[in-house]
Amino acid sequence: MKPTREHITGLMLAGGRGMRMGGVDKGLQTLHGEPLAAHVLKRLAPQCGALLISANRHPDTYAALGAPFGATIVADTLPGFPGPLAGLLAGLRTARTAYLLSAPCDTPGLPADLAARLARAMDTIDANQADIATVTTIDAQGEVSLHPVFALLRTTLADDLAAFLDAGERKVRAWYARHKTVEVTFTDERAFYNINSLQELSDLERA
C-alpha cells in the first residue's frame, strides 16, 4: 500500500556542525529574512502527518521555529556529531508512523511533491515494496547526482541502522545498500540545491 500523508513523519536534519560554514548552525542562517530551517519546514510540513527536527545545538531556537508546525526536537544519541545517519536513527526511533521522510535544513527549495513521488516509487511493482526511496537528479549535461539525505524510509529499519552505527559505519549509501532501495529521478536539480557556504547563501539571497 502506498504511504499517504498520515503514514509519514517528516524529519528535518539540522544536527550537523556546519564545518563548511565556519562552524555556524547552518539551519539558523537567514535567507530573505527567515532562517533556512523555516523555509524547509514550510515545505516539509504539508507533506507529513507529524514533524521532527534533528538538532544537536540550539534546541530552544529550533523548538520555536517548529512550534507552528507542532514539531518535536530530537537529538543524536551518539556522541561527536557522527553524521546524518545518527539524525536518521533518532528520527526512526521517535516516529510513531510507518514511514519517515528526511530532508536537510539547508535546501529551501525542496519540492512540494517530494513525499508523494517517493511514496509512489516505493509502492511500484518494480520496487517490490522498497524499504527506502531516495532522490537522484539529472543536470543539463545529463550528469546524474544522488541526494541520499532526501529519503523516505520504513521506520522498521531503526534496529538495523543502530547496529550499523554501533559497528562504526557512517556512510549513508553503504547503509542503503543493505536494503531494497529505489531511486527517484527529479528533473529540477535546483530544488535540491543545498547551501554549503556563507558565500553560496549570499549568492542565493541576491538571485
Predicted region positions:
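Nucleotide and nucleotide-moiety/phosphate-recognizing core
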Residues: 2-169, 174-193, 198-203
